[in-house]
Amino acid sequence: MPVPVRRARGFVPEPVPLDPGSDACILALGGQEKGTFTLTRGDAAFVSPHLGDLGDYRSQMNYRSELASFERMLSLSPDVVVRDMHPDYFTSRIAAVLGAGKVIEVQHHHAHAVSVMAEYGISGPVIGVSFDGTGFGGDGTLWGGEFLLARQHDFRRLAHLRHVPLPGGERAVREPWRMSLMYLLSLIHI
């Protein structure tokens, strides 16, 4: 049976099956780059198409339009909104205005671990490894290269790459050679 590598590259009407859990409709807004959202209903998670880099205004408008379409198509209105901890993300800024009674912040790399747990029906705990770029951490710094002991509702950071400056700011996320150079230079200055 083929396994989709990236379900959200196109319209995906078939839901990801979930273990029975909350009856609440949960809207997970995703991060800033490679934007997607997920709506849950009972034991099903409906993943949006890939909506682009949400730093771009057109992508933001498309994101809002797709979200409204999904809510109409599925007859869902979120009871809970889950957003990334990063305060400057588009998804973080719109979370409060989406009409849900409760907004929950989640650490970016913990969200990756939990999404894989949900997809495979694992309740945890697991060791989650995330090397996908930066994520706003609970200590107010940017995290990257995390090893987490993850459960569905919480996690403990077991290990991580050493903190080094981001050469070129957010460009370092899109141009990984910059971070490689910083780590090599940091070895010289031990």
Give the label of every model feature segment.
Residues 117-183:
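Active-site histidine-anchored catalytic micro-motif
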Residues 188-190:
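Conserved small/polar residues in nucleotide/adenosyl-binding loops
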